[in-house]
Amino acid sequence: MANYYGIGRTNYFAVKDAELFKDEMANYPVEVVTREGEDGTTLYGLLDANADGGGWEWSYVAELEGEDGEVIETDLEIDWAEVFARHLVDGWVAILMETGAEKYRYVSGYALAVNSKGESHEINLSRDIWKLAETLGENVTEVAY
């Protein structure tokens, strides 16, 4: 049995408040990277830090305090579009991309673009390429073995 290995990263983008952004990212399995923009401002990007090599995480374990003060661990969903919209400077677009494969059996790709208003577009290669391929001809086979 083969394992899926994915890798993900974002483009670089400007954030409203660097400390708030970095504080929130500390909750997620990501590495924050920076580079200098053309105007000298610091731009931020993310690299997936999934220890299993699976690409972007869509949930994380959070420690919440129960009614009696005990710490409860729970899985919480990560809505990346909402996260980026909350932090992006107006006019900037964050793009989250992931590619991966399970040997040569399944090859996949995903991209999400989102702006500060929360408007977004996504591409899922495993889903979207079929619609395009069928416009070119009637004989289209699966990309797998």
List where the protein language model places each region:
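Short, extreme N-terminal segment that most often corresponds to the first beta-strand
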Residues: M1-Y28, A144-Y145
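Short, flexible N-terminal segments of the mature chain
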Residues: E19-L47
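Charged interaction segments
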Residues: E38-Y145
